[in-house]
Amino acid sequence: MAIRKKSNKNPPVLSHEFVLQNHADIVSCLAMLFLLGLMFEITAKGAIIFVALQYNVTRPATEEQAAESASLYYYGIKDLATVFFYMLVAIIVHAIIQEYVLDKINRRMHFSKTKHSKFNESGQLSAFYLFACVWGTFILVSENYISDPTILWRAYPHNLMTFQMKFFYISQLAYWLHAFPELYFQKTKKEDIPRQLVYIGLYLFHIAGAYLLNLNHLGLVLLVLHYFVEFLFHISRLFYFSDEKYQKGFSLWAVLFVLGRLLTLILSVLTVGFGLARAENQKLDFSTGNFNVLAVRIAVLASICITQAFMMWKFINFQLRRWREHSAFQAPPVKRKPAVTKGRSSRKGTENGVNGTVTSNGADSPRSRKEKSS
């Protein structure tokens, strides 16, 4: 087996190119340090803060659930360490999908640089949206959210979460935080960075807001709804890159996008504007996690409405741009009329000749008449 010579291509250790090429291996080694810390008694107490969920309490069994006691969780400052560890996991998974799936497809399809970056973006996001949507739907079904919608606001504050619920939110925060270093690892263009920062910031703002304000029930429903619509868009864009005639997915996405925005507003107003507004306990209490006061409710509804309006504005601009491009592509080419020269020779040919041939009986030109008169 021949040994490949890489000495001329390998960048210097810890250089810019070295970090970009080997960032997945570097992050994997860092994550392994936390896992190895669990094996030793001295470091286990510190390592477990990063790996396992914190702040669990055991609720005693009731008469309805006499067979088992439930372990519930609340949030705290140690969750930042857990989010950091799973952010490293998200970077590793991102690199695996990129190297073993997307890069192989890119080599076969021979995309341009613009399509290459958009294909990678849609490939990564479609995989994440599908996974998160299936996971979130499983939580909704297992905790009877669909059969009893009043659980969205009943018994607020929802400061105690099941393992699946808390792990879902930790994973969401970790994934969207990992998107910041990925802008550097993936060599994102400078003109694309502001757009990326806007939607990453919006995700983190709303997910963290639902998590910290104990609106995790409402946040889960809205995330599943939003992720399903976004998954349809990115999977349609993947099919479009392979066949530019494919437009059915975008048409279905356009309808579901508008319906998704309406459902988001309806559920938000129903939960925050009516459900929580009629609750008996409307006092601000940080110890119990009760934020059901008028100012917080107005802020929550305002942030949701502004975000939905911003998304609709972007959606309308996107549809208008696609409509203009489609109209320009379908419009027939305009036939240009031949330019008519206004020189003296052309006028002489039209006035004194037939089919461009000068006749002997033609009238004299103004200059010749002037010379004769003189």
UniProtKB/Swiss-Prot annotation:
Basic residues bias: start-end ranges: 334-347
TLC domain residues: 117-326
Main location: endoplasmic reticulum
Residues recorded with modification Phosphoserine: S365
InterPro entries: TLC-dom, Translocation_assoc_membrane
PROSITE patterns for the chain: TLC (PS50922)
Signal peptide region: none
Post-translational modification, as annotated: N-glycosylated.
Record function comment: Involved in the translocation of nascent protein chains into or through the endoplasmic reticulum (ER) membrane by facilitating the proper chain positioning at the SEC61 channel. Regulates the exposure of nascent secretory protein chain to the cytosol during translocation into the ER. May affect the phospholipid bilayer in the vicinity of the lateral gate of the SEC61 channel, thereby facilitating ER protein transport. Intimately associates with transmembrane (TM) domain of nascent membrane proteins during the entire integration process into the ER membrane.
Cytoplasmic topological segments: 1-32, 103-121, 181-192, 236-251, 319-374
Residue ranges of the region described as Disordered: 333-374
Record's keyword terms, sorted: Endoplasmic reticulum, Glycoprotein, Membrane, Phosphoprotein, Protein transport, Translocation, Transmembrane, Transmembrane helix, Transport
Lumenal topological segments: 54-81, 143-159, 214, 273-297
Comp. bias regions, Polar residues: 352-363
Subunit relationships: Interacts with SEC61B. May interact with Derlin-1/DERL1.
Membrane topology, record value: Multi-pass membrane protein
Name by which UniProt lists this protein: Translocating chain-associated membrane protein 1
Localisation per UniProt entry: Endoplasmic reticulum membrane
Transmembrane segments: 33-53, 82-102, 122-142, 160-180, 193-213, 215-235, 252-272, 298-318
Protein family according to the UniProt entry: Belongs to the TRAM family.
One GO biological process term: protein insertion into ER membrane
Source organism superkingdom: Eukaryota
Glycan-linked positions: N56
Listed Pfam families: TRAM_LAG1_CLN8
Gene Ontology cellular-component terms listed: endoplasmic reticulum; endoplasmic reticulum membrane
